[in-house]
C-alpha cells in the first residue's frame, strides 16, 4: 500500500505531467494559474512546495503547499483515478504537512471544493492528523486578468 509510494519534490521537467494529472484527476476546474509558466514560478518560490507521489516510476499524485510566513496552505491534492483508495492522498498530506511545519507554519489550512463530497469525506478522515472543518470562513478570489480589466 503506502509503503510502495515514493514522495518527493517535483522536477521542473515533470510540470507538464502535473498539468495532465490534474486534468485526469478532475479534482478542480482549470484555473488561470494552470500553466507550465505558473508552475515554474511556483516551484522556485521559497515558501512553496509541490510534491509528487510515484509508484513504479510513474507520477500518480501531487499536492501543493505554500507558506507565506504566517500560515501554511494546501492546494491541488490530486491522485490519478486508477490509483485512488491506496493511501496515496493521505501520504501526500502527511508529507506536505510536515514540509510546511518544517518551514515554520504553526497552522495549516486546505482548500476543498464543495462540489466534491468525496473530498470532504477524505479530509474528515484526517482528524487523527489534526485536520478539522472550519465553518467560519468563506473564500473570495480575484483573478489578475479580471482585476486589471476593471
Per-region residue spans from a language model:
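A short, internal acetyl-CoA/4′-phosphopantetheine-binding micro-motif in the GNAT/acyltransferase core
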Residues: 77-84, 112-113
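Conserved beta-strand-loop-alpha-helix junction that forms the acyl-donor binding cleft
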Residues: 110-120, 141
Amino acid at each position: 500500500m503506502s509503503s510502495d509510494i515514493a514522495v518527493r519534490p517535483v522536477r521542473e521537467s515533470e510540470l507538464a505531467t502535473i498539468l495532465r494529472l490534474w486534468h485526469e484527476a478532475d479534482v478542480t476546474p482549470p484555473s488561470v494559474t494552470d500553466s507550465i509558466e505558473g508552475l515554474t514560478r511556483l516551484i522556485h518560490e521559497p515558501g512553496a512546495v509541490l510534491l509528487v507521489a510515484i509508484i513504479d516510476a510513474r507520477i500518480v499524485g501531487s499536492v501543493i503547499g505554500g507558506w507565506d510566513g504566517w500560515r501554511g496552505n494546501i492546494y491541488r491534492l490530486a491522485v490519478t483515478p486508477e490509483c485512488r483508495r491506496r493511501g496515496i492522498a493521505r501520504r501526500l498530506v502527511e508529507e506536505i504537512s510536515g514540509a510546511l511545519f518544517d518551514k515554520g507554519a504553526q497552522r495549516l489550512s486546505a482548500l476543498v471544493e464543495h462540489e466534491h463530497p468525496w473530498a470532504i469525506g477524505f479530509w474528515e478522515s484526517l482528524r487523527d492528523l489534526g485536520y478539522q472543518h472550519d465553518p467560519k470562513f468563506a473564500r473570495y478570489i480575484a483573478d489578475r486578468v479580471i482585476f486589471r480589466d476593471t
